[in-house]
C-alpha cells in the first residue's frame, strides 16, 4: 500500500445521503476479483443513461470540470449496505484518494482504509462549505496534522491512531506482519518438529 501523508487534489460534490454499496458498485460487476478495472463501473446507474455506457451529461462525475477530481464530498451514511469491498476498489480505481462524508457504513469505512484511501467524517456545515469550491480549487489533506486545508477554511478531523500509523507508513495487515518476520522465523525454529 502506498504511504498517505499529505495529499492535494480537487473535489467533486455528490451530496446525496445514504449512497449504499450497490449504488457505488452494482452487484452485476462483483464477478471480477482483481482490484483494477472497477472505476468504469463506479456509480454505474447514475453515470450512464439506460445502463448502456452512454454518459449522462447531467451527472456530476461526467462534467468535464470534475473529471479529474480525486476528493469526493458526499452526504451521510456513505457506503451503507452490503459489505462488498469491490465498492472501495471502484472508488480507488476511479481515482479517489479521499472521501469526506457525514458518516460511513462501518464496513465500507474500513474497506476504504484497507485500500489506501482516507475516509473523513465532517459535519454538514463543513461539507456545505467544501461543496461550494470551484472545480479548480485545490484542497490539501494533511494526515499527520489531521487537517483539511482549503480556500474556504481549515478543518480538523479524527482518525484512529492505528489506522493513521498504517496509512502514514503504507502498511496493510500483511505489511505489519512482515515487520515481525525475524521474530516469527526465530519462533518457528524453536517449535517442535511435528509442527514444522
From Swiss-Prot:
One of its GO terms (biological process) is L-leucine biosynthetic process. InterPro entries: 3-IsopropMal_deHydase_ssu (IPR004431), Aconitase/3IPM_dehydase_swvl (IPR015928), AconitaseA/IPMdHydase_ssu_swvl (IPR000573), IPMI_Swivel (IPR033940), LeuD (IPR050075). GO terms for molecular function: 3-isopropylmalate dehydratase activity. Pfam families: Aconitase_C (PF00694). It catalyses: (2R,3S)-3-isopropylmalate = (2S)-2-isopropylmalate. Belongs to the LeuD family. LeuD type 1 subfamily. Heterodimer of LeuC and LeuD. NCBIfam families: leuD, PRK01641.1. This is 3-isopropylmalate dehydratase small subunit. It comes from Streptococcus thermophilus (strain ATCC BAA-250 / LMG 18311). The gene is leuD.
